[in-house]
Amino acid sequence: MTLISAPRIGIAGITGRLGTLCAEEAGSALVGGLSRTADPQRNITTDPAALAKNCDVVIDVSHASTVPAHAAAFAQAGCAWVLGTTGLDQGAQDAVNAAAQHIPVLQAANFSPALTLFLELARQLGAGLPDYDAEILEVHHRQKLDAPSGTALAIGRAVAEGRGVSFEDVARTDQNGRRPDGAIGFASLRGGQIVGEHDLVLMAADEQITLSHRALDRRVFARGALLAARWLAGRPAGLYTMADALKR
């Protein structure tokens, strides 16, 4: 393994809100970006292969529909891939898993270091309080496309993992009817310009505990993405998480 101390960084989704912040944080390490509209003066292309050939690592904060094409292009180029896009269907996730056989891929629903530790606490709470009702509330800006958020689903998966059960068997996004024992419920709110709020509530008849995270500035995600990119470049092929990057 030969780590790269100053990797050349590309950004897929560079003209979006988070992509723009990632570009600012990357500074002189930025070599170009990927968007739906090319801008040669800014080294922005519409071709993922053209971007990847000039990069050591690409931070991908684009759209779920682009993931299969990006997976193929980045794997072919041998370019490390930091993937923060959420709302993937099974076909897109299969493409990510296949790419990780050839290149290092760090996949995260949320790049916040504090939220990464939140997930570990969620696992511990799930394991330690297996009979408590688990509910997850998430609030985001009105433009967000997926609900529940990828981060909320990651929290639910962490609780299920702590309890040693299949997330798919216990996730409850349909709120009609009596609450099943062992279910993990979700509630989503959309409005205004809220960056991101997540609460995990575990409830029993005589007590409850709430674990909360509030993102106050979207730049925390950009800084986390850059941390992940610099950690990932030069790693062996495989599928990594933000928790791996924080062990640096």
Swiss-Prot record:
The protein depicted here goes by the name 4-hydroxy-tetrahydrodipicolinate reductase
Q: What does this protein do?
A: Catalyzes the conversion of 4-hydroxy-tetrahydrodipicolinate (HTPA) to tetrahydrodipicolinate.
As for subcellular location, the record says: Cytoplasm
Species name for this entry?
Answer: Gluconobacter oxydans (strain 621H)
Principal EC category: oxidoreductase
Could you give one GO CC term from the UniProt record? cytosol
Recorded family membership? Belongs to the DapB family.
* Record-level GO BP terms: diaminopimelate biosynthetic process; lysine biosynthetic process via diaminopimelate
Q: Which reaction does it catalyse?
A: (S)-2,3,4,5-tetrahydrodipicolinate + NAD(+) + H2O = (2S,4S)-4-hydroxy-2,3,4,5-tetrahydrodipicolinate + NADH + H(+); (S)-2,3,4,5-tetrahydrodipicolinate + NADP(+) + H2O = (2S,4S)-4-hydroxy-2,3,4,5-tetrahydrodipicolinate + NADPH + H(+)
By its UniProt entry, which InterPro entries does this protein fall under? DapB_C, DapB_N, DapB_N_CS, DHDPR_bac, NAD(P)-bd_dom_sf
Which HAMAP family does the record cross-reference, listed alphabetically? Answer: DapB
PANTHER family membership: 4-HYDROXY-TETRAHYDRODIPICOLINATE REDUCTASE 1, CHLOROPLASTIC-RELATED, DIHYDRODIPICOLINATE REDUCTASE
**Which residues does the entry assign to the active site, renumbered to this chain?**
H140, K144
Query: Where, by residue number, does NADP(+) bind?
Result: R36
Provide the binding site for (S)-2,3,4,5-tetrahydrodipicolinate.
H141, G150, T151
Tell me which UniProt keywords the record has, alphabetically: Amino-acid biosynthesis, Cytoplasm, Diaminopimelate biosynthesis, Lysine biosynthesis, NAD, NADP, Oxidoreductase
Q: Which positions bind NAD(+)?
A: G13, I14, T15, G16, R17, L18, G84, T85, T86, A108, A109, N110, F111
Molecular function terms from GO: 4-hydroxy-tetrahydrodipicolinate reductase; NAD binding; NADP binding; oxidoreductase activity, acting on CH or CH2 groups, NAD or NADP as acceptor
One Pfam family named in its UniProt record: DapB_N
Q: Which EC number(s) are documented for this chain?
A: 1.17.1.8
